[in-house]
UniProtKB/Swiss-Prot annotation:
Key words, A-Z: Cytoplasm, Initiation factor, Protein biosynthesis
HAMAP family associated with the record: eIF3k (MF_03010)
UniProt-listed GO biological process terms: formation of cytoplasmic translation initiation complex; regulation of translational initiation
Protein family according to the UniProt entry: Belongs to the eIF-3 subunit K family.
Function statement: Component of the eukaryotic translation initiation factor 3 (eIF-3) complex, which is involved in protein synthesis of a specialized repertoire of mRNAs and, together with other initiation factors, stimulates binding of mRNA and methionyl-tRNAi to the 40S ribosome. The eIF-3 complex specifically targets and initiates translation of a subset of mRNAs involved in cell proliferation.
Protein name: Eukaryotic translation initiation factor 3 subunit K
Lineage, opening ranks: Eukaryota, Metazoa, Ecdysozoa, Arthropoda, Hexapoda
Assembly mode: Component of the eukaryotic translation initiation factor 3 (eIF-3) complex. The eIF-3 complex interacts with pix.
GO cellular component labels: eukaryotic 43S preinitiation complex; eukaryotic 48S preinitiation complex; eukaryotic translation initiation factor 3 complex
A Pfam family assignment: CSN8_PSD8_EIF3K
Length: 222
């Protein structure tokens, strides 16, 4: 859905154009930006700059604060881990937002993800599932982050453990994630995440530089 922002001169701009000028701080545009946040949740899209602009407008206009939009923005930030979007959004929260019980729950979920305690995350997510049921693709976005962590942590992993880390998924769903990440089966119980050849090999390179090679350059610096 296209969102156009009407300026005082009667002309219209896209949200991206509006965010590039001083109009981003105009509270008259907040409702359109909030609607844009809701569309991101519905359509599994993401615009960090617009979402941070909403939180900034709340800072300047605390009487316009919308907690439901705040929750959605924070949860959308979680879907973009391992990027630091959540940290940036958290830094823009007002004291009354930080004291909110649901905000604290989301912060706790973020902390759990950051320390890669994925089993606990899925347990907490199940308890609080109504909080993000309106966010399309939320679970798969988290699984994408889990896959990233698994990919840089393991060479091989037991299938049962991998299923648990990905949220207790079924075998058929596991197969799709194995294929998506380019992993392979090893026997009945193991999944090969990375072979030794896939690991980046570092090499120390020492180059011998003779004085004559830099003499002319040093002379120019004197």
């Amino acid at each position: 859905m296209s969102h156009l922002v009407k300026m005082e001169n009667g002309q219209s701009q896209t949200i991206q154009e509006m965010l590039g000028c001083i109009e981003r701080y105009n509270p008259d545009h907040l409702k359109i930006l909030e609607s844009y946040v809701q569309d991101q949740a519905k359509n599994n899209t993401y615009d960090l700059e617009a979402n941070l602009a909403v939180l900034k407008l709340y800072q300047f206009n605390p009487h316009m604060l919308n907690f439901d939009i705040t929750y959605t923005i924070l949860l959308k930030c979680l879907t973009n881990l391992p990027h630091t979007d959540f940290v940036m959004a958290k830094c823009l929260l007002l004291p009354q937002q930080m004291k909110d019980e649901n905000v604290q729950t989301i912060i706790d979920l973020a902390d759990i993800l950051e320390r890669a305690d994925f089993t606990l995350f899925w347990q907490r997510a199940e308890v609080n599932r109504t909080m993000f049921r309106h966010i399309s693709g939320f679970h798969d976005s988290i699984r994408k982050f889990v896959s990233h962590v698994v990919g840089i942590t393991f060479q091989t992993i037991k299938k049962d453990l991998l299923k648990e880390l990905l949220g207790g998924i079924e075998d058929s769903t596991l197969e799709s994630w194995i294929k998506r990440n380019g992993w392979k089966h090893q026997g009945q119980d193991l999944v090969v995440v990375a072979t030794q050849d896939d690991k980046i090999k570092t090499k120390n390179i020492t180059e011998k530089i003779e004085f004559e090679n830099v003499g002319a350059l040093m002379a120019q610096c004197i």
